[in-house]
Amino acid sequence: MKTVTEFQNKNILVLGIAKSGYAAATLLQKLGANVIVNDGKPLAENVLAAELQAKGMDVVCGGHPLELLERNISLVVKNPGIPYSNPILVAAKEKQIPIVTEVELAYRISEAPFVGITGSNGKTTTTMLTFEMLKEGQKHPVIAGNIGTVACEVAQDAKENEVVVTELSSFQLMGVELFQPKIAAFLNLFEAHLDYHGTKKEYGLAKANIFKNQTENDYSVINADDADVMALSAYSKGQKVLFSTTKEIEDGACIKDNALYFKAEKVVEVDDIVLPGQHNLENILAAMSIAKLLGVSNEAITAVLKRFTGVKHRLEYVTTINNRKFYNDSKATNMLATEKALSAFTQPTVLLAGGLDRGNEFDDLIPYFKNVKAIVTFGQTAPKLVRAAEKAGLDTIESVDTLDEAVVKAYAHSTDGDVILLSPACASWDQFKTFEERGDIFIQAVHKLI
């Protein structure tokens, strides 16, 4: 960890605890700050807040009183999930108090360079692929952020010869000031999180913060097939490395003659890749570009792609029952992810979908229903998905209350050779704490059929 003195004796407000807030508060106390911790949950129900209080921190729970800003606050470190419309953040902005997220702290203390990966879909798969390729290539990667350990915990132990690989959301990237990844990858962009950002434009600009501090000594890995990403890459001063699944790119990564190429050099045959889905070729090209820029050999990249079958809850194969294959794609929290999941299969498919209603309709899914023989909907969006399925002309459409019921119904509507796919196209928070919980419940329900 770098020697950092900028926080000593400063009053710093950590807003929202959870994992990242707890880690940030603990780090800041170690760095000599006077830490004030604030969380909306009452102290009596807040185990992490009680632990921080026991460490000697000033803890205020049960709301976000504006009076906290009268304590000569030098910096606010916010939980990514707390919107900037929260009155205490609005007031902090008016007072010109800097507002950052925990990843900014991680960057400031880290001896190791960062690789940052963002996009609407594919972040986790690309991050894991990058980590595995760098590990196989003996580049000493450590993984942080939304996957695994909180970034500022990882950064404390990261050494100069290591690489911190981190998946970054738009929420995290809105709160960066100095964060400067050696390599920044922007995978794709489509309309999402409008309840937080308001418009697609603002969402895209938040993502583009990944380029904010890059210089000509850094690299920006860009999806050349995404017009929005290409436009936002104008914010990067780094060396641009493009990737594409649709056209040849001499100075970047592409697919040619059934092989993946980087800067006109063949790296791996497509037939050697075991990860399913056309969309995953985009993720692979991005990860391969990062790995090649950091000096990983073609042999190491190929070795990873011959064994990497995917990430849990992302088009995860579960089991086969009576020649029906079950797949868990609970991470599909938006339509684009479900479109890509449906495109991965040519077999007749029974789709399970539904979840939190964020105000959108589902007509964009209709062209992807060509192999869908039945749909079972659940959650808040069930009526909207039923409408889309009816417009698509599906014969078998069911709505149920729970995911357990959906699995039973889906199996009943399937026949020999079918795929049964959970790909909700919605966030999970109407019925589940996380998409991981939703996926685990799906897997448990599937195994009950055996």
Curated annotation (Swiss-Prot):
A GO cellular-component term linked to this record: cytoplasm
Protein name: UDP-N-acetylmuramoylalanine--D-glutamate ligase
Cell location: Cytoplasm
Binding site for ATP: 119-125
Top-level taxon in the UniProt lineage: Bacteria
Keyword Mitochondrion applies: no
Enzymatic class: ligase
Catalytic activity entry: UDP-N-acetyl-alpha-D-muramoyl-L-alanine + D-glutamate + ATP = UDP-N-acetyl-alpha-D-muramoyl-L-alanyl-D-glutamate + ADP + phosphate + H(+)
Family matches, as NCBIfam families: murD
Gene behind this protein: murD
Pfam families cross-referenced by the UniProt entry: Mur_ligase_C (PF02875), Mur_ligase_M (PF08245), MurD-like_N (PF21799)
PANTHER family in the record: UDP-N-ACETYLMURAMOYLALANINE--D-GLUTAMATE LIGASE
Protein species of origin: Bacillus anthracis
